[in-house]
Amino acid sequence: MSVFELRQGRVPLLISLPHVGTQIPAELAERLVPRALASEDTDWHLERLYRPLADKLGASLIVPRYSRYVIDLNRPPDDQPLYPGASGGTGLVPTRFFSDDPLYRDGAEPDATEVAARREAYWLPYHQALAGELERLRAAHGHALLFDGHSIRSELPWLFEGQLPALNLGTADGASCAPAITERLGALLAGQTRFSQVVNGRFKGGYITRHYGRPAEGQHAVQLEMCQRCYMDEACDPSGAYDEALAGQAAPLIEKMLKEMLAWQP
């Protein structure tokens, strides 16, 4: 079985959801602390929100099957920090929860050989497929658009104070896409009052946005980090916390964002 699913669309847009996977291989699961098996740091139910939009708009969609505890697809292959000097965060092969508690049982952490093997088995196939799909879209349409979707708990006191804005749009401070795309999406977010929002705030875009956002080559990428309160009941067990009523308010705005990207012309 493939470590990811790619559905090819008919428009120049690819939606990537790199942190929705939940599978953990049995041989790895037995080395993790019991708490890890609940996959609390997953971007829960995000595929349920985005897949209907991708189908409706004819966009391509790529999603992993495996948990970010196996490999973090939004980190560089050499595991260099995305925000040098910043505290917190997790690496290519995480060994700690967001809360900085250990993921692994004592003495069971992966060594360099295992990290390299996971990179080869999980990270590389996903990125080869992602890059290949962007190349296909560019060849077919003259340009390619990448929307990297994420979600996060609204409050993570060990990483930041208070509550995050509901919608956090990142364009690597404008480097990952044409200025007009940032302007169009920023204006759309600023023009609504249902969700708090910020552009290039705490979340400016991870490896995927920064690496594949190459405006000079006709390849434009943005990241949306959405608080889970937008579509989930955060007081519940996350595996069953999807809220149809909340999601019904968030989905139309995300659809408008995707349409704004598609309406842009180089």
Enumerate the language-model features and the residues they cover.
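N-terminal catalytic or cofactor-binding beta/alpha core of small enzyme domains
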Residues: 1-146, 151-266
